[in-house]
Amino acid sequence: MIFKKIRKGHADWRNFLCSTPARDYVFQKDAYEDQIDRAAKNIRNTDCVIIGAGAGASTAAGIQYGGKRFTDNFAEFIKKYGEYYMTDMYAAGFYPYPSEEAKWGYWSKHALMNRFDPPALPLYTELYDIVKNKEYFVLTTNVDHQFYKAGFDEKRIFATQGDYGKIQCRKACHPKTYDAKDLFRKMDKARRDCLIPSELVPKCPVCGGNMAMNLRCDNYFVEDEAWHEAADRYAGFLEQNKDKKVVLLELGVGFNTPIIIRFPFEKMVRENSSYSLIRLNMDEAVVPESFGERAIGIGGDMAKAITDIKGLVL
């Protein structure tokens, strides 16, 4: 995971990363009802909540990258490029498309399906209801804009990995991103045989080269001014609340990019006796045993867990 040199005057985001896993992970054996009760009590009694959300949160909310949602909506792409390669939207994003017309033929549809077309989903709106009267901040690796749609204050969200709604210079020749909603709509209407017309292929307004999605996948990811400002606000929030009672509410964060949310959250709990961790995860709800009562690991259906916690918090 590559984070670039920090611009002068901005917080060094790398200070908040952590690559050290716990050595004492356990699956808690507490009854589900007891875990929900404890989680709700911790949230009710805390000064502030820091939400850390990974891909599992949006999967639980209903944004499925595979299965019927993929095969129904991307049938022409599966037929054209082969089911061996087109197994789901994640794999399709890494396919070596033979042309810019083909690349944007895919990505315009992907962005519309996962960023622009879905409304605010219940898991996210219920999560907002839980924290809206608290001091809160959201740290997320998701790029689907669900937190914004659900009503969270955009000044309290740091989306570290980009945005499906933005594009950038493929070689990052300048530190700026561009809103692509209208362009993607045009591409979607004009697409034929998985390809968009050549006249719709975006070109960098500075160097004239190809454009790319604003997603962190290599060293060319553009961290624009808004990205750095969000990082600064997150750093400020941590500093302002370091001596308060804080709940770290982690949702759907696995071991794909754990250095951004999972390991840093554990580090904060180790270093701050007034911090506690609530970890919701379908299959990886392990928590450090040494955290004792300051950690709750809730496995299974995250959407149900959020609903149940909300029922006890409000």
Predicted regions and their residues:
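Conserved catalytic alpha/beta core of Sir2/sirtuin-type deacylases, generalized to analogous enzyme cores
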Residues: 1-314
